[in-house]
Amino acid sequence: MTAAVWTLLLAYLFGSIPAGVLVARTYGVDIRKVGSGNIGATNVLRALGWGPALVVAFFDVFKGGIAVLVARAFGLSDWMLGGVALMAVLGHNYSVFLRFRGGKGVATSFGTLLFLDPALALWTFPIGLSVILLTRYVSAGSMTGGVAAFVLSLALGRPLWEVATVFLMALLIFWTHRENLKRLQEGTERRLGERAEAR
C-alpha cells in the first residue's frame, strides 16, 4: 500500500484509541455505563471529576493532531491532510476497538484543526467556550464551535480543501449530537457540572 493509504489507516486506528474508556477503567468504572454512556471528556468529567476529564481531553485533542503531523511527515497533499484529519475523527466516533461505537469527535476535530490551521482553531475555541460558559451546555458550545469554524474558514478565505474538511467535521459534530440537540429542544439536556449516575 502507498504511504497515503497507510497514513489514512493509521489516522483511523490512532483516532480509535478510546482514552475515556481506558482512563475510567483505571478508576474501576466503565464509562459507557455511566451518565450519557459517551466516552468523551464531558461524561468523564461528570463521572470522575476534572482530573481524569482533562487527561481524556488532552489525549483526544492530540491524537488528532499527531495524525496530521504524520501525514505532513510523509509529504502528503493538502487534500490528503484533510482526509487524514477526517479519518482520525471517524476513528474516535466509530472505534474499531469498541465495535464501531465511540465518542462525539469534538476534541479530536479541534486537535486536527489545531495542527492543520492553528489560527482558525484559536479563533474558533473562544466562541465555543463562551457558549459553554454562558449556557453550561457543552453540546451547544460544541455545535456552535463547529459552525463557527466553518463560517470563519469561509470568511478568512481558506483554501477549498480546508473549507471542505471543516464543513465535514462540523456535519459529523451535528450528527453525533443529534440526541443532544433533541434534548436541548425539550429542555432535558444535562448542564456542565451535573454529576452522572450509573445507567
Swiss-Prot record:
Subcellular location per the Swiss-Prot or TrEMBL entry: Cell inner membrane
Pathway assigned to this chain's UniProt record: Lipid metabolism; phospholipid metabolism
SMART domains: G3P_acyltransf
Domain of life: Bacteria
GO MF annotation, one: acyl-phosphate glycerol-3-phosphate acyltransferase activity
Membrane topology: Multi-pass membrane protein
EC top class, as a word: transferase
GO cellular component: plasma membrane
Main location (coarse class): membrane
EC numbers, comma separated: 2.3.1.275
Transmembrane portions of the chain: 3-23, 50-70, 78-98, 113-133, 154-174
Keyword terms of this UniProt record: Cell inner membrane, Cell membrane, Lipid biosynthesis, Lipid metabolism, Membrane, Phospholipid biosynthesis, Phospholipid metabolism, Transferase, Transmembrane, Transmembrane helix
InterPro entries assigned: G3P_acylTferase_PlsY
Single GO BP term: phospholipid biosynthetic process
Reactions that this protein is recorded to catalyse: an acyl phosphate + sn-glycerol 3-phosphate = a 1-acyl-sn-glycero-3-phosphate + phosphate
PANTHER family (UniProt xref): GLYCEROL-3-PHOSPHATE ACYLTRANSFERASE-RELATED, INNER MEMBRANE PROTEIN YGIH
Annotated family: Belongs to the PlsY family.
Function: Catalyzes the transfer of an acyl group from acyl-phosphate (acyl-PO(4)) to glycerol-3-phosphate (G3P) to form lysophosphatidic acid (LPA). This enzyme utilizes acyl-phosphate as fatty acyl donor, but not acyl-CoA or acyl-ACP.
Complex and partners: Probably interacts with PlsX.
The name this protein goes by in its record: Glycerol-3-phosphate acyltransferase
Protein's organism: Thermus thermophilus (strain ATCC BAA-163 / DSM 7039 / HB27)
Gene: plsY
